[in-house]
Amino acid sequence: MKKIALLVITTISLMSCDTKSNGHNVPSNATGYTIDSSANTDLVRKAANALVNNDTTTYKSCYTSDAKFYENNDSATLTQNIAGLQAMHDKGIVWKLNKIGAIWETIYLTPKASGKTSYVISYQNYTLTRGGKSIVVRFNVLNNIKDGKMMAEHLRYDNSGIAELMK
């Protein structure tokens, strides 16, 4: 009986040390937690689908009006990003989303200086086609999200094939 009482007390003590956040148990010394499915991961999927459908209205609705895009060594505003995508579309380049591989969200318990608390990381695989020429481009994407909108997007990918398609 003493062992059962000791087990119950130990269990209660350990449970009371955890911080609950959005239904997830988070240790008291954690700075945040990671989940594999959320409204924010759905938002990233929504933007990816809008991109391949050339639906700029839906695409823009996923971002704050002052969103910044950091692609490899360049940066752009939302307006500049959409203009670049439109230029590709005007050249006849068609985007196809092959898959979004791994995708997860990291949520920080204390907002960063900019107010960001959520970061969605994803690996996105697209085929870009122009005429009879196709290339596969794999994007490593980090989206900074605040209040259900993406405020920054960091992309890393090999853009050499895209330059060839644009010629």
Predicted regions and their residues:
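Sec-dependent N-terminal signal peptides
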Residues: 4-13
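Short, low-complexity N-terminal intrinsically disordered segments enriched in polar/charged residues
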Residues: 17-57, 61
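A solvent-exposed, acidic/Ser-Thr-rich amphipathic alpha-helical stretch
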Residues: 57-112, 116-118
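A mature extracytoplasmic/lumenal domain signature
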Residues: 63, 73-74, 124-126, 141, ...
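Exposed beta-sheet edge and beta->alpha loop/turn motif
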Residues: 118-152
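Low-complexity, intrinsically disordered terminal/linker segments enriched in charged
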Residues: 152-167
